Amino acid sequence: MKENFDIFFRRKPALMLVSLKKNTRMRYGSILAKEVDCTYSHAVKILQTLEELKLVEFERKGRIKLIRLTKKGRAVADAIDNIQGLIR
């Protein structure tokens, strides 16, 4: 299944969106990086791109930046999740 999924998507960004969708709480970048098995610095670069695409937004709570999906991001995550289910 992993190989089929990788044919269609860049694995880490897609997994980040799906992970944010499945867990409705706002998330920290470091936790998200661990969930998708990448370094924190790589996760930050991906998240910056997702923010530019208006798929995620950040909320600062003191020193911590929390991440959540936008409406558009949720729609994209739903589509990725559906496709992932179809190619299993």
Give the role of each language-model region.
Residues 1-3, 74-88:
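Amphipathic alpha-helical dimerization/coiled-coil segments
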Residues 1-16:
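Short alpha-helical segments that sit at the start of domains
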Residues 8, 23-24, 61:
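Helix-turn-helix/winged-helix DNA-binding modules
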Residues 14-19, 75:
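Pre-recognition alpha-helix immediately N-terminal to the DNA-recognition helix
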Residues 18-24, 81:
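Short, locally clustered residues in the helix-turn-helix/winged-helix DNA-binding domain
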Residues 25-34:
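Short acidic, hydrophobic short linear motifs in intrinsically disordered regions
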Residues 37-52:
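Short amphipathic alpha-helical interaction segments
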Residues 53-62, 68:
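Beta-hairpin "wing" of winged helix-turn-helix
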